[in-house]
């Protein structure tokens, strides 16, 4: 079995269906004896350029170990699913299990957002006095 990195982008109006899509795709990989080393849902992100007049998409990253037949099946599923805007499947030399840079950046920004949201109510209460 070979190692692959898979990234696919889903239409932003179909974001609520992403969990089901991930479950379906990971299920087909594990049923065929493959392994999922990393699965990251990056959420809705701004696109670098418009695709089909869309400026945002829902991103998902998977690092898997699977046979070529499973990857061909996944590629066909991506092609016939209208909600998938783009996909990229790359073969890697080894399994990648650490967090991606995108997810690390997202987690670094999360505490700052919480700090700002906590500071706003305090500022409003001071202004009311």
Swiss-Prot record:
Residues 104-129 have a biased composition (Basic and acidic residues). InterPro entries: Ribosomal_bS6 (IPR000529), Ribosomal_bS6_CS (IPR020815), Ribosomal_bS6_sf (IPR035980), Ribosomal_S6_plastid/chlpt (IPR020814), Transl_elong_EF1B/ribsomal_bS6 (IPR014717). It comes from the Bacteria. Disulfide bonds: none annotated. Keywords: Ribonucleoprotein, Ribosomal protein, RNA-binding, rRNA-binding. Residues 100-129 are annotated as: Disordered. The keyword Aminoacyl-tRNA synthetase does not apply. GO terms for biological process: translation. Belongs to the bacterial ribosomal protein bS6 family. NCBIfam families: S6. This is Small ribosomal subunit protein bS6. It comes from Vibrio parahaemolyticus serotype O3:K6 (strain RIMD 2210633). The gene is rpsF.
